[in-house]
């Protein structure tokens, strides 16, 4: 457009002053920029509409796990857990994979139970069923005698503290991430939870202390630091049931010891389910359940399972270099 104006005005050059020509170029440049601005805005708007359409489709998807109408809240006083004759399978296209069939497991109140076995044995799936991230097709899962399928999911998950292998931290301060376990906690309670989780020392070394922003998914903290913040959150929540899913498997030796000490504090007085590949993590627990293809093949304390010379003893021997006791 600038070139067009220049050519059109060239024939009458004798009537145009340099100032007028500058003004013409300036106006043309300004108008062109405005059109470019409008064009960019329309492109962004079209992308936003496309993204919104995709999100709407996701939000409109029916919930696979839904509460029954008028479902009561789950109330837990002891933490007794019963998996009774459960059956669970999933379908991928025309293929159906059965994970559990007539599976039974009883965990007494306050008992600490380790789940071990080869990858794909069903360890993590069992914890997800307890958290009701999926519904079983057969049988029932009871917590203190209450069928979790008949209680609200929100009340169920308020009773279970969950510490995964990869800590789930938000792009907020350390204090806010810990307080996610109990939003109305006081600063003193947050600090005490951090102390019990062996996190206070590294937090106080940070320039902003508890006000330090952790970054997206906690990228500004090391793996051991993220895990201790996650444990502090679970301590603050003070739930009667605790689920640990490979909570120390990705840590170095020094961080693992600090996290292991914090977990020992966290497990006191709670019903605990500990999923582990590293058997040293579960050797001190009350019971160890060995799973294979969705079935319990061995069940007992560490010393008994080692003495039996079965699957657990073989796993222990491979991990410890034949040091059995």
Regions found by a protein language model. Give the residues of each.
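Conserved catalytic core of two-component sensor histidine kinases
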Residues: 25, 32, 157
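Conserved E/DxxT/N motif and adjacent residues on the DHp alpha2 helix
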Residues: 57, 64, 179
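Cytosolic ends of transmembrane helices, especially the final helix of ABC transmembrane type-1 domains
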Residues: 30-58
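Alpha-helical transmembrane segments of polytopic integral membrane proteins
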Residues: 4-5, 35, 52, 200
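A hydrophobic transmembrane-helix motif
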Residues: 1-28, 81
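ABC-type nucleotide-binding domain
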Residues: 74-325
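An intracellular "coupling" helix at the cytosolic face of ABC transporter transmembrane type-1 domains
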Residues: 1-2, 40, 44-47, 63-64, ...
């Amino acid at each position: 457009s600038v070139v067009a104006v220049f050519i059109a005005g060239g024939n009458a050059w004798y009537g145009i002053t340099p100032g007028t020509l500058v003004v013409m170029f300036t106006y043309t440049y300004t108008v062109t920029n405005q059109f470019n601005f409008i064009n960019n805005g329309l492109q962004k708007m079209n992308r936003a509409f496309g993204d919104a359409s995709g999100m709407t489709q996701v939000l409109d998807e029916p919930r696979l796990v839904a509460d029954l109408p008028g479902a009561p809240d789950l109330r837990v006083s002891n933490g007794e857990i019963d998996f009774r004759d459960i059956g669970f399978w999933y379908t991928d296209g025309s293929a159906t994979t059965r994970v559990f069939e007539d599976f039974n497991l009883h965990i007494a109140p306050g008992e600490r139970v380790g789940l071990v076995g080869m990858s794909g044995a069903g360890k993590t799936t069992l914890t997800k069923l307890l958290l009701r991230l999926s519904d079983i097709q057969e049988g029932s899962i009871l917590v203190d005698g209450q069928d979790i399928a008949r209680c609200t999911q929100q009340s169920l998950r308020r009773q279970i503290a969950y510490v995964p292998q990869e800590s789930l931290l938000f792009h907020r301060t350390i204090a806010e991430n810990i307080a996610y376990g109990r939003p109305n906690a006081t600063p003193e309670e947050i600090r005490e939870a951090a102390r019990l989780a062996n996190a206070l020392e590294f937090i106080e070394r940070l320039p902003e202390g508890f006000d330090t922003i952790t970054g997206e998914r906690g990228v500004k903290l090391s793996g051991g630091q993220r895990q201790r913040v996650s444990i502090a959150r679970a301590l603050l929540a003070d739930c009667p049931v605790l689920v640990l899913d490979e909570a120390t498997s990705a840590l170095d030796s020094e961080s693992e010891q600090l996290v292991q000490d914090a977990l020992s504090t966290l497990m006191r007085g709670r019903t605990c389910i500990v999923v582990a590949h590293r058997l040293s993590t579960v050797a001190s627990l009350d019971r160890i359940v060995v799973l294979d293809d969705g079935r319990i093949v061995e069940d007992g304390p560490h010393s008994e399972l080692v003495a039996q010379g079965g699957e657990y003893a073989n796993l222990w021997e491979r991990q410890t270099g034949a040091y059995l006791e």
